[in-house]
Regions:
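N-terminal signal peptide c-region/cleavage motif recognized by signal peptidases
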Residues: 11-13
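Short nucleic-acid-contacting surface segments enriched for D/E, G, S/T with interspersed K/R
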Residues: 73-89
Length: 120
């Protein structure tokens, strides 16, 4: 029992979400585009989105999402979203200037009105 307690206390800092520190929680960005790739996995799932640019070619965005286990508990499966889906995504942008990365807060598929909202 003592060993288990020590292990939990020792590993607790690693449970902190280091990835969230990479994103600017004070700002929200919205992108709209086509899902090109989806990876539902642990520790974070990822969406690759070709977002419509205001002028010129579409920009490829990397959108980080929650872990597969968390998403599954919220009803999101590997087949919920598919490449080719048109999506509107809001999230916190990367703190790195010019990086096209978001931490997902909401995702909507306008074709059928499916929406997911949540996150840390």
């Amino acid at each position: 029992m003592l060993s288990l307690a020590c292990l939990l206390l020792w590993s607790w800092p690693s449970l902190a979400h280091h990835a969230l520190s990479e994103y600017d929680s004070a700002h929200v960005t919205t992108i709209e585009g086509t899902l090109s790739e989806i990876r539902i996995k642990n520790p974070h799932s990822t969406l690759m989105v070709q977002a419509s640019g205001s002028s010129g070619p579409a920009d490829r965005w990397t959108v980080e999402w929650l872990a597969a286990l968390v998403l599954k508990s919220e009803g999101v499966e590997n087949t919920t979203l598919r490449p080719g889906d048109h999506l509107i995504i809001t999230g916190n942008p990367s703190k790195e200037p010019g990086a096209r990365r978001l931490w997902l807060r909401t995702v909507t598929r306008p074709a059928d009105g499916w929406t997911w909202t949540g996150g840390f």
